[in-house]
Amino acid sequence: MASLRSSAIPVSDPAAGLRITEIFYSLQGEANTFGLPTVFIRLTGCPLRCSYCDTTYSFEGGERLSLEHIIETASQHKTPYICVTGGEPLAQPNCLILLQRLCDLGFQVSLETSGALDVSKVEPRVSKVLDLKTPTSNEDHRNLLTNLDYLTQHDQIKFVICNRADYEWSKQQLENFQLQDKVSTVWFSPAFAVEKGTVALPALA
């Protein structure tokens, strides 16, 4: 699975499908569809190693499934909402094809992405939820700022806030890039359960 840590994975044949960690049905816990029944499709692999990541189990393993099987499984639940997440879904090029096919079938699709990989080719009907990495993630140097040019009012931006420094940094990005004018919603998402000894978490105020 080392290739899924690379940001330059070659495009593969759609027939190869995708490596999937899990597909499950639950209530959306964040973003604009908060509280709505949603099918989550979690893709395997991620090029980042954020200090506060709560889905490290998705870094490796998974099961390779055809696009048809993934769509059929997701369609068994009677909800129009599908969230494609990871890991980093865009680490697998066939994710782009999956997103398009889901939209063609009439689903309301959101994509949770780290923002470290190019989003310019993501299907426009998809609501991108771009997680701009804050300093405490230890991955803020991986933010691909050109992605901000491809955000619309259909999209959202998320900042994971672990401490006051993250909060101030996030406010500065809002001002620098006028992010509130680019997207429908900007989320400040607090994180508390960071692995002990990895980072210090001083009080927010």
Regions found by a protein language model. Give the residues of each.
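Charged/polar, solvent-exposed surface patches and flexible loops
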Residues: 22, 72, 76, 149-150, ...
